[in-house]
Amino acid sequence: MSEQNHPQTEPQLDENQIIALRREKLNNIRQQRNAYPNDFKRDSFAADLQAQYGEIGKEELDPQAVPVKIAGRMMLKRQMGKASFATIQDVTGQIQLYLNNKGVSQEVLDGFNHWDLGDIVGAEGTLFKTNHGELTVRVSDIRLLSKSLRPLPDKHKGLSDQETKYRQRYVDLIANEESRNTFIKRSQIIQSVRNFMVGEHYLEVETPMMHPIPGGATAKPFVTHHNALDIPLYLRIAPELYLKRLVVGGLERVFEINRSFRNEGMSVRHNPEFTMIEFYEAFSDYERMMQMAEDIIRNASRTVNGTANITYNGKEVDLESPFERLTILEAIKKYNPHYTDEQLNDAEWLKKEIVKHGESLPPSPGIGSLQLALFEGCAEGKLWNPTFIVDYPVEVSPLARASDTKQGLTERFELFVVGRELANGYSELNDPEDQAERFKSQVAQKDAGDDEAMHYDADYIRAMEFGLPPTGGCGIGIDRLVMLLTDLQTIRDVILFPQMRPE
């Protein structure tokens, strides 16, 4: 079968017929040689060649006959008389190949003409410029390294079905340059965060992913079982209590970038497993943590976007200016100036207003919890530019240090950008007796039906009894940070393999 009739007929076949045809080709190759060789050694990448030689003129480049060995996936292929062109794609970009019967043997050319889009090839040759000025490899030898048995998505339509993008991320990455760039940026963002922390003299650590007691946040855990020990274990909902144990042990600045797991609903902002950074610094407080969070985010934006003034969903976001700071009540009043102080301290009025804004009533009946629920319904979504909401109520902050000057409040903040939470931090509670009482209060809430309330962690109390220095701590959601800095609206677009219902 010649290359001329195969591209004309394959698109008319259904997928199963195409796969069968390609399997037949693979079987023919197997009869002649190793179908999956592993001895081709490339020495060049497409983007590096484009950067080094792309601006050199044809008359200057052609005489140099620069030798290259390059490999990648064949994305385009066409014949023009006795010559054939192909475009291959590697991790850095694309480059064109040129073959004719003067440069390669007829046997090699015949083999190439039977290959398909999606096949992975290795080519050796020299660089030249076409008459249109396109940097091209004049091929002297080319080999099939891996056969693609399934057809790629249409080159014009790409992979447009969202669910298929998430289920078959490998195809999405092949077909969509935007997706590849997103995950390259994600890696760069994480590296930027890590470099910043190291520059601040923090030590990167790893703490357990399976906990005997779920803790560090108010959320439902995933439960598993350890057969040898015959005990239940919980996938961590947060690393906080282990990291603070390390501060007790004298590791005064620690951070961890890793996964946490919460057995809760999925949405455009929530995936059951997600990546976050948590960091803790001895002899620090929530003021220092707010500045750290601000600097980390600003630095990451500059690293991947070249600026801290970005656009999200068509609207500007100012990450360059100092982040605004508001209390919960100040934020409520900013967007609802008609509310009075009397109303905002009336439990029954708050409950009615919370329901009116479509929020659920909190398990804890305290005024602070009700004010927070109202904030979430009437103000949170309006915080577009970065805003720290500070001084959270004690009843919803079981691990935060109580304020010395504001009764019933803690030295806690949450950072909101584009209407959603991005970070959470506080001056850590370091009084073991106070912490024990708060754990008991959480247990009472759990007994009363609050599934997300914390357990009593006796070992953490024991660690605190050795003395936890004054400490500040903070957690930043990496997935949401990537969404912000890549202008993407759903968390599934920034997680390589998001959780999906079974097919």
From Swiss-Prot:
What does the UniProt keyword field contain? Aminoacyl-tRNA synthetase, ATP-binding, Cytoplasm, Ligase, Magnesium, Metal-binding, Nucleotide-binding, Protein biosynthesis
* Name recorded for this polypeptide: Lysine--tRNA ligase
Q: Does the keyword Lipid metabolism apply?
A: no
PROSITE patterns assigned to the protein according to its UniProt record, in alphabetical order? AA_TRNA_LIGASE_II
Q: Which residues of this UniProt protein bind Mg(2+) 1?
A: E414, E421
GO biological process per UniProt:
lysyl-tRNA aminoacylation
Give the source species: Neisseria gonorrhoeae (strain NCCP11945)
UniProt remark on cofactor binding? Binds 3 Mg(2+) ions per subunit.
Please list the cofactors this protein needs: Mg(2+)
Family, as annotated: Belongs to the class-II aminoacyl-tRNA synthetase family.
Query: Where does it live in the cell?
Result: Cytoplasm
